[in-house]
Amino acid sequence: MPIEKITSRKSSVVKNAAALLQKAENRSEAGLFMAEGARLCADAARSQTEIAACFFTENAAKKYKDYLDPVLKQAEHAYCIEEHIAPMLSDTKNPQGVFCVCRMPKRRADGLPVSAEPDTRPCRHVLVMENIQDPSNMGNVLRTAEALGVRHLALVGTCCDVYAPKVLRGSMGAVFRLGIRRFETAEDCLKVLHAENITSLAAVPDSAATPITTIPFETGNWAVWIGNEGNGLTNEAIEHCHDRVTIPMRGRAESFNASTAAAIVLWEMERNGAGGTSHG
């Protein structure tokens, strides 16, 4: 593949790529997003994410050759950029000098990328996040979900964009492989889950709710809902879920951080065989 040299910050190719860092609307309209860093870009390539363009500096080409090779094999266009251009494409203080413009993966009805292996397990489990707006929390949750084998997530309401730079970095590439579906309202999501024979549980900081440790995740299909960092779940979600569950707490803390609560929920699913890492 021919590699083009870019020496000017005024390059339209660079400007168009940089716009993908700025707004979710830009990414959505283009159907593209930016991945930054040698490891993340290589992960995108290994996950069969379509790579529209790769940008790299000469220093990065030498330092990260093993990571760049699979990326360049898949990239439709490749550009060697001057060092002073790299900050335009970066969301970090010290960019490595490796960037990819990726196409948002095509997804099946269950949210899994078409390039991913189908989910053939007898029980299906979903983590639902409602109005989770902190990119760091979102990235951590996605990373934890993949690590524990829970492959399906639903994002409801005003959740942040999973293709935002901080989410991508925090997820360690999990976005490329997880099943992710978005819903405008809790009602929309609940209707779909109900049609798929999935029981919805609202996670709340209320000792009167059912302890999550007693839920038989090893049988049936379950969805656990996690709410906004500051306000928790909406009344609509709580009222229409089949039951309320809580994470037993000691001490004086009133609630968990959203990503911490999600991690505990995901572990409970896996501990009871729901996640699937110990069951294929």
Please give the residue ranges for each predicted region.
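Active-site/ligand-binding-proximal alpha/beta "capping" segment
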Residues: 201-253
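Short acidic-hydrophobic, aromatic-tinged amphipathic segments that line or gate anion-handling sites
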Residues: 4-8, 77-82, 179-188
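RNA substrate-binding interface of SAM-dependent RNA methyltransferases
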Residues: 46, 111-208
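Boundary-proximal intrinsically disordered activation/regulatory segments immediately upstream
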Residues: 1-67, 159-160
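Short, aromatic/basic amphipathic alpha-helical patches
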Residues: 63-74, 237
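Amphipathic alpha-helical repeat scaffolds
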Residues: 37, 133-141, 256-261
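Structured adenosyl-cofactor binding patch, chiefly the S-adenosyl-L-methionine
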Residues: 144-148, 162, 167-175, 235-280
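Glycine/small-residue-rich loop that forms an oxyanion/phosphate-binding "nest" at active or ligand-binding sites
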Residues: 71-98
